Swiss-Prot record:
Record organism: Gossypium hirsutum (Upland cotton)
Protein's UniProt name: ATP synthase subunit beta, chloroplastic
Protein function: Produces ATP from ADP in the presence of a proton gradient across the membrane. The catalytic sites are hosted primarily by the beta subunits.
Residue positions binding ATP: 172-179
Pfam families, sorted: ATP-synt_ab, ATP-synt_ab_N, ATP-synt_VA_C
Top enzyme category: translocase
């Protein structure tokens, strides 16, 4: 692994003063820079513009070389606003790609695309940096063994299990519990797998990034008193930033995650919110660089850009990066090139349902819409597969009967269908679960449920052994023993009331 010493300019590995160019043209976030003959920088080299604008304000803009134009000129994309830059300003070629801080010192901190801390907590205490552009791991380094990544969340582990080192698409609108689910996964990987997480906020709202940070501090995912005890590093490139920053912030987050995997040999969770904004930023940059657009106005290099990012997210013999990517679907059109290209890389999808959230069933993961390539008997075993299929069949039958129930009522159903409905309602409630990170809001302690316990619980409901228990006993509990204990308590309470 290539480690570069940090320098006075964060995000830049080495400053070679002798290789200087001058700005010849500025078009928004794109700069053309002329260099002396024979001193041309390489593609992806970081360029730094330092100086003063006409008002005497200090300027420090980092750019990345994207094209070599001929006549000793290069075209570069700025990672921050180009306000105040003028033609003729001096540009330093750093001789290397953008480098960002990596390692344990990044935990509990918020960074921008250049790896500069933006949380007002002082400089990052690390001398270890790593370039954001790297090759994907070689074939011989990959771990090809198929294994389940246990999350401790019943609905996910049973019906749409995650693959260790896989990629998961997270679909859901506003206010259905995406953030809480993300925070619970961060909490559980730290407790159950001894792993850490990196959150890449790509082109989303600054307010959402701030809310996430505040909620993480409140729930203990970020420990303000002792940052080293934190479980996550945050990298933000929000929607008000130039397209260059939004296009590269995903790579900055990935580089931090790769260090935890390759050097610390940990299991890492990498969250990308939102993968669509990564494509959108690439589309803007592509147009600014003068490339001919492809279908629906996207960049012609869409598949290559997506593949370059996704192929670095994988399991190696040292550790794994499991990635959970929020996917915005423009105009709900799944055939749009951006989501369609993303789907090709996903191993599982977790779909959050507003209907379930309205019923108060959290996590509001839709058990029928969520899918996983891991749910096969040869991978998860016959018992798990059979239980999952029977749960889905029961819920599907309940869904089909809901119209009849709404019009005619439960009494008009056959005995068999009434039993199916009763069990489906118990299953629906048993798929809910109290979260550790929601403890501070709800007051009920969080529960981590192992896969074996999850399967045992659903098998007991399906077998009919628990038909006599009230359905509210299954709501917001951990394993099945808690449900039976809750049923006993409810019975005692009702007797006392009488």
């Amino acid at each position: 692994m290539k480690i570069n010493p940090t320098t006075s300019v964060p995000g830049v590995s080495t400053l070679e003063k002798e290789n200087l160019g001058r700005i010849s043209q500025i078009i928004g976030p794109v700069l053309d820079v002329a260099f002396p003959p024979g001193k041309m920088p390489n593609i992806y080299n970081a360029l730094v513009v330092k100086g003063q604008d006409t008002a005497g304000q200090q300027i420090n803009v980092t750019c990345e070389v994207q094209q070599l134009l001929g006549n000793n000129r290069v075209r570069a994309v700025a990672m921050s606003a180009t306000d105040g830059l003028t033609r003729g300003m001096e540009v330093i070629d750093t001789g290397a790609a953008l480098s960002v801080p990596v390692g344990g010192a990044t935990l509990g901190r918020i960074f921008n695309v250049l790896g500069e801390p933006v949380d007002n907590l002082g400089p990052v205490d690390t001398r270890t940096t790593s370039p954001i552009h790297k090759s994907a791991p070689a074939f011989i380094q990959l771990d090809t063994k198929l294994s389940i990544f246990e999350t401790g969340i019943k609905v996910v582990d049973l019906l749409a299990p995650y693959r260790r080192g896989g990629k998961i698409g997270l679909f859901g609108g506003a206010g259905v519990g995406k953030t809480v689910l993300i925070m619970e996964l961060i909490n559980n990987i730290a407790k159950a797998h001894g792993g850490v997480s990196v959150f890449g906020g790509v082109g989303e709202r600054t307010r959402e990034g701030n809310d996430l940070y505040m909620e993480m501090k409140e729930s203990g995912v970020i420990n303000e008193q002792n940052l080293a005890e934190s479980k996550v590093a945050l990298v933000y490139g929000q929607m008000n930033e130039p397209p260059g920053a939004r296009m590269r912030v995903g790579l900055t987050a990935l580089t931090m995650a790769e260090y935890f995997r390759d050097v610390n040999e940990q299991d890492v969770l990498l969250f990308i919110d939102n993968i669509f904004r990564f494509v959108q930023a690439g589309s803007e940059v592509s147009a600014l660089l003068g490339r001919m657009p492809s279908a629906v106005g996207y960049q012609p290099t869409l598949s290559t850009e997506m593949g370059t990012l996704q192929e670095r997210i994988t399991s190696t013999k040292e550790g794994s990066i499991t990635s959970i990517q929020a996917v915005y679907v423009p105009a709900d059109d799944l055939t749009d090139p951006a989501p369609a290209t993303t789907f090709a890389h996903l191993d599982a999808t977790t779909v959050l349902s507003r209907g379930l959230a309205a019923k108060g069933i959290y996590p509001a993961v839709d058990p029928l819409d969520s899918t996983s390539t891991m749910l096969q008997p040869r991978i998860v075993g016959e018992e798990h597969y059979e239980t999952a299929q029977r749960v889905k069949q029961t819920l599907q039958r309940y869904k089909e009967l809901q119209d009849i129930i709404a019009i005619l009522g439960l009494d008009e159903l056959s005995e068999e269908d009434r039993l199916t409905v009763a069990r489906a309602r118990k299953i629906e409630r048993f798929l809910s679960q109290p979260f550790f990170v929601a403890e501070v809001f709800t007051g009920s302690p969080g529960k981590y449920v192992g896969l074996a316990e999850t399967i045992r619980g659903f098998k007991l409901i399906l077998s009919g052994e628990l038909d006599g228990l009230p359905e509210q006993a299954f709501y917001l509990v951990g394993n099945i023993d808690e449900a039976t204990a809750k049923a006993t308590n409810l019975e005692m309470e009702s007797k006392l009331k009488k």
